[in-house]
């Protein structure tokens, strides 16, 4: 299994592990947990709701290998999800403490994170290596002064974050690298070629730097961190999307980590400048995460879309059966 991270989307080069990164502690990782920072930045971030703590039985379901229906239903959790979906006009996108299941959009009918029901959410979470990383490996890269120190393997509790769905333009997402409270690098996040970006590069750079200086600088818990932003299509607003650890588990995108660690002076801003560069800069995103073996084993000749529809249909039937059983029990009281 690759070593993915939430919005971190990382599979670090072996050479990066020997670079002089600032020591990364458990607290640095916990500070990037969504619920740790969202309230402080909610005015400049996407509308979101947090369900915490997740029932341990549901965590165990996510943790189990394979994509399958839960053996038991989670009516309280499902009702909370439905309530939030209704509040957010019918569509949300999910994440856990750190990660969104961006590597699992292949199983979605829309090839996006857009979810309209609990079954949509469960299917994405169960199909994602990024979510598996949150469950078991979030603290793998932490530094410990003493090898005998107790090492944390998971947070004390897990949370499900549901964020209001917007049809965003991937071309307007950017990743920002902060070293010792100074913005040192900005990278286009979706490594495809968008010709119009070069025409507005200076404007984008100015807006992102102003956003950082006004809303982020000296306001986050860590001195070294990575954050993602989205610039609206009309370029009138910048939205904070996420915070990520400053370390090799976070994808440097158009930079090597050596470049980021040695950067000085005003921040550099890199865009894909040609289709050729785009082809050289990427293989298909999350290609190594696509189509787990059990999908082929379980689908029995179905297409991925048909398998997803069957999963959602069977989950809906299971929930309905559970509701009928509860009603029968109530009638017998």
Regions from the PLM with identified roles:
Residues 1-333:
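Preference for protein termini
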């Amino acid at each position: 299994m690759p070593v993915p991270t939430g919005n971190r989307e990382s599979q670090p080069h072996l050479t990066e592990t020997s670079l002089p990164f600032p020591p990364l502690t458990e607290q640095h990782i916990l500070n990037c947990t969504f619920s740790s920072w969202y309230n402080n930045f909610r005015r400049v971030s996407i509308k979101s709701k947090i369900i915490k703590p997740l029932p341990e039985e549901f965590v165990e379901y996510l943790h189990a290998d394979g994509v399958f229906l839960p053996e038991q239903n989670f009516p309280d959790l499902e009702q909370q999800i439905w309530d939030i979906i209704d509040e957010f006009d019918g569509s949300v996108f999910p994440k856990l403490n750190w990660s969104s299941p961006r590597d699992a959009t292949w199983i979605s009918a829309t090839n996006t994170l857009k979810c309209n029901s609990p079954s949509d959410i469960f299917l994405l979470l169960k199909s994602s290596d990024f979510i598996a990383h949150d469950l078991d490996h979030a603290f793998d890269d932490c530094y410990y002064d003493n090898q005998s120190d107790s090492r944390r393997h998971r947070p004390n509790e897990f949370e499900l974050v549901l964020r209001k769905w917007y049809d965003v333009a991937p071309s307007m997402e950017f990743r920002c690298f902060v070293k010792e409270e100074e913005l040192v690098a900005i990278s286009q996040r979706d490594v495809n070629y968008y010709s119009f970006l070069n025409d507005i590069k200076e404007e984008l750079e100015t807006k992102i730097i102003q956003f950082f200086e006004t809303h982020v600088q000296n306001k986050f818990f860590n001195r070294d961190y990575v954050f993602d932003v989205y610039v609206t299509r009309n370029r009138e607003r910048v939205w904070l999307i996420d915070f990520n650890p400053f370390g090799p588990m976070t994808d440097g995108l158009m930079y090597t980590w050596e470049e980021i660690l040695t950067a000085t002076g005003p921040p550099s801003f890199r865009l894909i400048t040609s289709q050729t560069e785009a082809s050289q800069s990427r293989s298909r995103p999350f290609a190594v995460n696509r189509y787990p073996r059990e999908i082929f084993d379980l689908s029995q000749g179905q297409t991925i879309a048909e398998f997803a529809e069957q999963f959602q249909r069977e989950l809906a039937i299971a929930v309905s059966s559970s509701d009928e059983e509860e009603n029968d029990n109530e009638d017998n009281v």
